[in-house]
């Protein structure tokens, strides 16, 4: 009985060890998913098609993944639009500040103020 417990614990350690996840790093380096069932032709393409060549109707998992990708794409577009608007507003603000600084540093007329008569108080 004790030998069975030792054997089971060694099997559990082997199953949870680095050996079980060894291919994940290689798959990431090759541009694939860390998990082989994450994405790719095996999960994205239909499992079968009709004999006359029509594609099979999409499965629930395919529809769910498609909806997730569309949602992510919408969010990316929204965030890039917000970034573009923010950059444009920042550029306008910087341009206005630069114009104000330029006006501050312009030469000011001094002689005309001295020649004009003082207003009666």
From Swiss-Prot:
Residues 98-121 are annotated as: Disordered. It comes from the Eukaryota. PANTHER family: 39S RIBOSOMAL PROTEIN L52, MITOCHONDRIAL, LARGE RIBOSOMAL SUBUNIT PROTEIN ML52. InterPro entries: Ribosomal_mL52 (IPR034596). This is Large ribosomal subunit protein mL52. GO terms for biological process: mitochondrial translation; translation. Transmembrane segments: none annotated. Component of the mitochondrial ribosome large subunit (39S) which comprises a 16S rRNA and about 50 distinct proteins. Keywords: Mitochondrion, Ribonucleoprotein, Ribosomal protein, Transit peptide. Its main location: mitochondrion. GO terms for molecular function: structural constituent of ribosome. Residues 98-109 have a biased composition (Basic and acidic residues). Belongs to the mitochondrion-specific ribosomal protein mL52 family. Pfam families: MRPL52 (PF18699). One of its GO terms (cellular component) is mitochondrial large ribosomal subunit. It is found in: Mitochondrion. Residues 1-22 form a transit peptide.
């Amino acid at each position: 009985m004790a030998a069975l417990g030792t054997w089971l614990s060694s099997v559990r350690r082997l199953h949870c060890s680095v050996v079980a996840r060894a291919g994940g790093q290689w798959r990431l380096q090759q541009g694939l998913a860390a998990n082989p069932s994450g994405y790719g032709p095996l999960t994205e393409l239909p499992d079968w098609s009709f004999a006359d060549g029509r594609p099979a109707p999409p499965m629930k998992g395919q529809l769910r993944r498609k909806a997730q990708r569309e949602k992510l794409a919408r969010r990316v577009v929204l965030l890039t639009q917000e970034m573009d608007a923010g950059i444009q507003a920042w550029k306008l603000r910087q341009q206005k500040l630069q114009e104000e600084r330029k006006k501050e540093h312009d030469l000011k007329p001094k002689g005309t103020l001295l020649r004009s008569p003082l207003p009666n108080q």
